[in-house]
Amino acid sequence: MDDTPRSAPTALAHLRVAASTTDFTRSCDARTGSLLAALAAARPAGRVLELGTGVGEGTAWLLSGMDRAARLTTVELDAGVQAIAREELSADPRVTFVTADAGHWLEEYSGEPFDLVFADTWPGKFTHLERALDLVAPGGTYLIDDLTPSRTGRSPTRPR
């Protein structure tokens, strides 16, 4: 069975090239992206939080599944990496880019909860987990990426 997604966001090709030229290797794969789009589509007018924008591949997948009334907030510490996502995706009025440490952002955020929280960086996954879970609306979804075991056999206790 081939479970490769049949379609992808238009911006994805450019974002993958940008990731390659900047040696950014932590983007979500196509299967994860397809899941993100499906989860976003299941939340009409949903509020979506992405922790770890990276170059924007996950962001593009989320936007591809969201309806016009949905809103996405995406948080990234590395302004240079996030600039790639901003350049390609900021014309979409549904997305708000935040350049900040996701841990600090989680500590300071006092707005409404989110229907979908996608944690693709350390805060919200390995640190600040309880706070991230507190931001999931009742009936909402919390999803993490990149929890594969380390090749060194060590558990993921700190960023490398």
Where do the protein language model's features map onto the residues?
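A short alpha-helical cap/connector motif
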Residues: 1-116, 123-143, 147-160
